[in-house]
Amino acid sequence: MHKRRRLLAFATVGAVICTAGFTPSVSQAASSGDGEEKGSYAETHGLTADDVESINALNERALTLGQPGKPPKELPPSASAPSRAPSDDRETPPAEPLDRMPEAYRAYGGRATTVVNNYIRKWQQVYSHRDGKKQQMTEEQREKLSYGCVGVTWVNSGPYPTNRLAFASFDENKYKNDLKNTSPRPDETRAEFEGRIAKGSFDEGKGFKRARDVASVMNKALENAHDEGTYINNLKTELTNNNDALLREDSRSNFYSALRNTPSFKERDGGNYDPSKMKAVIYSKHFWSGQDQRGSSDKRKYGDPEAFRPDQGTGLVDMSKDRSIPRSPAKPGEGWVNFDYGWFGAQTEADADKTTWTHGDHYHAPNSDLGPMHVHESKFRKWSAGYADFDRGAYVITFIPKSWNTAPAKVEQGWP
């Protein structure tokens, strides 16, 4: 038996729980004017301080495994190395028979939820196809999936998500006007006020739309392009026709190099260096802006208004300084999760609110207090609502082979 560990002192008492009812986008929710704040990830999911510590440690372990060349994150000045080994209770879900059908999901308030084992069954029936043939999820894939939210995107995209081609939308005029024409709330510090106004100036709906528009342009450029040079020329033609500011990106930028840096593009059973065999797809990352460990402690607690803003012309977000560092606690006992990932793929549903985003709650630990991993399929408003742990939402483009079915044109939420 495991004893329940110390409880978190939650940052927001009586907060809106993001898993229930209607919730606006993460940016709009932060400045809705109704006096209510978003709940933390831990509060929403009933997690303890030890749970959050373990989740963040496992997220860092996944980053090390998935991106071995990426420098490790810096610890906050007030922090020390973990007193125990990063969570040793994660388990890889067992294999599921290829012919075993999923059970019904639990649906409520724009979200359908199931245990990870049942998601594997659905994945095998719906998303596993390679060249039209169903595949059993391999042990390596189940290992990736077991890491939780990032695991869902990881297993569907192929490599660990690099977040290099990220888009967002920030309303500079709204930000300046709100700073000038509104005042801090009672007992709100200037740093809290500026962080809240910055968060409220991001629009996830517009950021998602920008990523979809760019992915559409990329997919047009991929058609009938059998070498990278033809793809780049096609891409520049499409951008010229659309008068898109991305045309002025440097030829060495992430925008133009994204395809060649995709591992599956080079694999013989993937793209095999043929752009026409690839397609652009989308996932999302929610994270915290105040990651500069040499900067203001207030920004680490309440957000850095200047950090991770998109280019006003292209919508591109420079993610090079994203080290997946969580929000710093402002009070003893607070704990914040370092990020959340959601998988979109290549759905063709025009109405963003009807799209489905697949993500996990935490790593798979069925024999610990944390418990088994659950997989959520959320409508866009539910996904974009986010948590108080995060003040940025980026929409990222990557590539997968067309022969994979992990990003179908239509996604049915749950299982009938």
Curated annotation (Swiss-Prot):
Active site per UniProt: C149, D340, H359
Origin superkingdom: Bacteria
Keywords: Acyltransferase, Signal, Transferase, Zymogen
Annotated Basic and acidic residues bias: 86-103, 295-309
EC number: 2.3.2.13
Disulfide bond among keywords: no
InterPro entries registered for this protein in UniProt: Papain-like_cys_pep_sf, TAT_signal, Transglut_prok, Transglut_prok_sf
SUPFAM superfamilies: Cysteine proteinases
Chain spans, region Disordered: 64-103, 290-331
Post-translational modifications: Predicted to be exported by the Tat system. The position of the signal peptide cleavage has not been experimentally proven.
Catalysed reactions, semicolon-separated: L-glutaminyl-[protein] + L-lysyl-[protein] = [protein]-L-lysyl-N(6)-5-L-glutamyl-[protein] + NH4(+)
Protein name as it appears in the record: Protein-glutamine gamma-glutamyltransferase
Alphabetized GO MF terms: protein-glutamine gamma-glutamyltransferase activity
Signal peptide bounds: 1-29
Low complexity bias spans: 76-85
Positions in coiled-coil regions: none
Stored Pfam families: Transglut_prok
Propeptide stretch(es), residue numbers: 30-85
Enzyme class: transferase
